[in-house]
C-alpha cells in the first residue's frame, strides 16, 4: 500500500508540474505555437537585462555605454537598445530556419546583418553577412561583434568597424545593472 501511495503522489506531482509548463500563448483565439530556438539564440538570452560600462575606441577615446536587452514577440526575438556616448542604436536577434539572424540599426546610417562565426559556453562571435551589400571602401559599417562572458554579470563586447575605408577595433567592458 505504501508503494501505491508513493506512486500516486509521484504521478500527481508530475502531472501538476507538466501542466504548469504547458501554458500556451494566444492572441485572441490564435495559438502562437511553440518555437524551438537555436543554441546561439539561447546564448544571447544570457544578455537579457540592463548593462553599463565603458567603450574603448581604437583612437584612445573612452565613452559611456549602456545596453538593454529585452525578449519580445512571444519569446522569439531579442531587441537591444544600445547607447554609446549618448547616441542610441537598435539591434534585433531572432532565429530563421534554425540559425541566429542579427540586424543592427547603426548610427553610421547602415543596417548590417550578422551570422554566427563561432560560439562556445563563454562566448559568441558574429561576422558580417554579405547580403546587405556593404563595401569597406564605400560604406561605414560594423563588420563583427562578439560577447565574452567573464561570468553572468561581467561581459566584454568586441567589435570591428569599417570607417572611411579603415578597419578599426573597439571593445566595451560592461556590467549587469538589472
What does each model-found stretch correspond to?
Residues 27, 34-37, 53-136:
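Central antiparallel beta-sheet cores of small beta-barrel/beta-sandwich binding domains
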Residues 73, 120, 149-153, 178:
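Residue-level recognition of beta-strand termini and adjacent short loop/turns
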